[in-house]
Amino acid sequence: MFSAPCGFGKTASARALLAGKRVCAISAEDPELSLPAPGGKWDVLLVDDLQWLKDSAEQEALCAAIRENPEKKFVLLTRGTMPGWLLPFQLAGVLTVLGPWDLALDRDGVDRLLAQNGIAVSDTELTAIHIESRGCALPLSLLARHLAAGEKYSSALTDVIRREMYSHFDELVFSRMDLETRRLAMELAPFEPFGPELARIVSGNSRAGELLEQFQAETSALRPERIDSYSYWPIFRRYLLWKLEREQDEARLRALYARGGLYYELNEDYDRALECYSRSGDSGKISELLVRNSELHPGLGHYDEMEPYYRMLPEREILSSPVLIQAMSMLDAMCMDYEGSERWYGALSDFASSRRRSDMAAREARSRLAWLDLALPQRSVEGMLDTFPKAFRLLKAKEIKLPSFSVTSCLPSLMNGGKDFSPWSRKDDLLYKTLRVPVETVLGRDGVCLADCAMAESKFEKGENVKDRMLSLMSKLSRIRRDGTPDIEFAVLGLLARTQIDSGRAGDAKQTLLTLRSRYEAEEMTRFLPNLDAMLCRVDMYLGNDTEVDTWHREKAPKDPQRLRLMKRYRYITQAMAELMLGDEDAALLTLAPLEPYCEACSRYLDSISLHLLRAVARWRQKDPGWRRELDTALDTAYEFRFIRPVTQYGAAVLPLVEGCGWNKDAQFLNELTEGLKQQAVYYPDFLRPRRKMTGPLSATERQVLRLICADKSNAEIGEALGIKLATVKVHVSHILVKLNVSRRGEAKTAAEKLRLI
């Protein structure tokens, strides 16, 4: 059985496979349908349009024919899913079902199809054609016709083919649906994934679930996501969206999106609800949901995702809500518009002072002001030495009720999370004794074990042995998970991974992070995954996993230097590290450039150290003398706080710079850094080293020789194994070393592994 939506080439594939055989072809759509006599001159019965075989008597007749004629072959074609009445044959192993991906062409198949039509395209065009068509027969056949006529592949031609496909769907699919199913199919197109409940709310049709089942049985245009959850095939969804825009006026579309917004609101999916309400133009609902969403996700990085909706609100509506004013102040700060942030802070202060102190709205405003005093990135951490005790007293007096914080901003660090607490590190022992209670009280769940984790991280950054502190933290991990927040857990396990890397156990660090990632993914705590994946990428840099680093850089790196997003700063720095490892120093410098003003304005000392160290490496590789200035700036900042590991973590990449820089403010401090860098260089000698590029391809014989080199065979053993003279082996080895851009046999093995040659 071939089961696939319209356009996947079921009929053409079947006829090609059955060429030369005695075939009896019938269509279940034929009102005069009748099965051929068993003794007829046919070996294969081809039944097309099986989705229209609805009569139970005809179904039973076909089943009987299959059972009673085991010597015959039956090929069934359907646009729908496999019907239940054929399930016994599948379970018995006599029915094989081929789906859409079995019929879709791979990249090589697309290339052969075009070649058969006398069409030559570039590799880039071939890749684009395969991705755009998804290997589907209909768009490929339409494209081949145009290209064979001399037209060039372009976006304009893609649009022409899309319109031709839409005409095909109009005639062969859409026109055959009843009006009720047509309307439902169109109205569900903007909402994916969807199920019966969403279908009922959006369409207002109590029979929506039943119609969905019928629609799928007849077209298989839906892809099951999970039980009672579907999405359309992308090509068909684009067609339905096009159809919806053509057949519905603006008022009906707004009403449709409003109903979709209601469904998502009821299911507390506020991201999708806001998207729908913005399409419907309902600013009142947008305002209401932004307030509700901020209460569900206080202090988290939802501001980035929600920014377009905040920006579309009228100012008078924002000024009526302390929650929205607070959000605008934080949002402007995250966009580095500190003047705008302070303007909104002033508006919130005015809101509080213009009402009686006992007014609950004034209390809400005071609570939000206290939150901003602690959370705004432009507020210094030195000032927080007074802010925390003040907030502690107000909480005790029940004058404010603080929203929750994200003390780490979803980063694997407390010292360098929502704030950079480097200045506190100078007096970490004293502050632990005096501020631990007020800080943990003010932060509530976010304060559980915070002080212990911060203390361990502070000592770690200063180069101390934190083994016992880490053991103590790991013993408290269950308490953090029970009473605290995943933010602190991420900080603790992030610190554990860093200590493992620092002791030469990067493989253990990767396992630590992968285990945490699996748990976060299973519990749908997706807000941590981007930074967790970036940290995994850093571990892969230590391990020399070029392919994994390249994959992260290609698929997950931010790559938006024109619009700095502060919540992505850890990823920007990781991106620059990846670009250095990939040998693109100019790209690394471009990635880092927007971070410098932020580091200066918000006193981000630890990020500044990384920024200047990475820029020093890039300039050093480019033989730009400016590398000394960059390195001096990084070392000066590290020396100010006596930080060791923010520098030594860059090991082999930074060691030659430090050894030749001439920095002379403190010889003992420099010696500590140098020893730490040497130790990391021993553990990870190729850290951030640009990947080697081959100077030419290896011949078949050279590949065989390389495999034997990697198996630690001597030249004599290689000659004996391949039946060639020793002198010839030496020539091959010499050529291999040149092509791999290495000088020794041991380096050849490492290069071959990284280049996936063995």
Q: Can you say where each PLM-predicted feature lies in the sequence?
A:
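Alpha-solenoid helical repeat architecture
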Residues: 271-272, 282-283, 321, 357-368, ...
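Linker/hinge segments immediately adjacent to helix-turn-helix/homeobox DNA-binding domains
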Residues: 149-166, 572-581, 585-594, 598-608, ...
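Alpha-helical sensor/transducer elements of the RecA-like P-loop NTPase core
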Residues: 12, 60-128, 132, 138-146, ...
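Helix-turn-helix DNA-binding segment
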Residues: 685-734, 738-740, 747-757
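C-terminal boundary/linker of central alpha/beta nucleotide-binding cores
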Residues: 124, 166-245, 255
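Extended alpha-helical scaffolding segments used for macromolecular assembly and cargo binding
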Residues: 250-323, 331, 340, 344
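Amphipathic alpha-helical "lid/sensor" segments that cap RecA-like P-loop NTPase cores
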Residues: 97, 115-167, 179-183, 189-193, ...
